[in-house]
Amino acid sequence: MGASFLTGVLGVLIDLKPAALLINDKINDSRLLDNKRILEILNKLGLDLVREKLNKFSNEEIEYLYLAKTARECLELQKWHREFFNSVSESGEVLDKKVWAEANYQIGKILGYPETATLEYIRMQIEGIEKDNNYRSRMERNYYYMHSARYENEEFEAYDLRLNLAVNEYLPVTAEIMQANIKKRWLD
């Protein structure tokens, strides 16, 4: 089971994020949720799951998983994810900047990302700002989402650090794997 799946589930369980947007990944010719045990575990944890297959941007159909403590949150995330998909062309070009920006803002909010990071991501995309070395180095050193240039440390403390501490406590094997990547920040 992938670290992104586990950290997404954990983020919801510790109330860091209202919902998680995951992918039913293919592993060894089967999909993650083909293992019914995982669905049973999610149910025992009190989590709801909505599944939807989409195939925009490629010929491959991707099954998205909207996971939260309530079906209402799952459906809200699904709604905004669809809005995002509808605001871009098959090639990924933004068709409606206002709809695209609002969809990304709402998705970031539902995923629990710091607002400063979400707003900078939207601004960079809308204004077509080049991804410079500072941008690339922030991507290289942080997990989970694109941190803003100005508030990177505050965002790390508000989201990443809380999730990483929970991963250390509840998912020690995953923590070990994630900490092996010495380029990524962990508890500092």
Question: Where on the chain are the PLM-derived regions?
Answer:
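A conserved ligand/cofactor-binding region detector
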Residues: 1-95, 103-106, 113-188
